[in-house]
Amino acid sequence: MADITLISGSTLGGAEYVAEHLAEKLEEAGFTTETLHGPLLEDLPASGIWLVISSTHGAGDIPDNLSPFYEALQEQKPDLSAVRFGAIGIGSREYDTFCGAIDKLEAELKNSGAKQTGETLKINILDHDIPEDPAEEWLGSWVNLLK
């Protein structure tokens, strides 16, 4: 089993690029990783460390590729008390639902007993053309919280 499972939800690929970049950085730091783009709930370990990275689609909506995962969290209410997670949202402050998808995912993970490590990073694409940069900066402090 990987030390850290990265879960990405993306419409245009931005969150996937961030997940791949962070997986590379985590491996350079000595962690093993598994990156899953739009996984189903049953594809994930019910314990360990998850890093959830999601863009926001439409009016604060979960990206299509992560909707089945989100809906399973809501409907099945799995026991995720053995999961610690970090969260990164990507969105635009032009919308009043800025990073609404990561807010929804974070809430459902907590409702299922998962414990959040660190604060959620919310990346405004209007300020960061390359969302990998602020995500990498955040990752350094997040990894320290895992120790």
From Swiss-Prot:
InterPro entries: Flavodoxin/NO_synth, Flavoprotein-like_sf. Belongs to the flavodoxin family. MioC subfamily. Disulfide bonds: none annotated. It comes from the Bacteria. Residues 4-143 form the Flavodoxin-like domain. One of its GO terms (molecular function) is FMN binding. Transmembrane segments: none annotated. The gene is mioC. Homodimer. This is Protein MioC. Probable electron transporter required for biotin synthase activity. Keywords: Electron transport, Flavoprotein, FMN, Transport. One of its GO terms (cellular component) is cytosol. GO terms for biological process: regulation of cell division. Its cofactor is FMN.
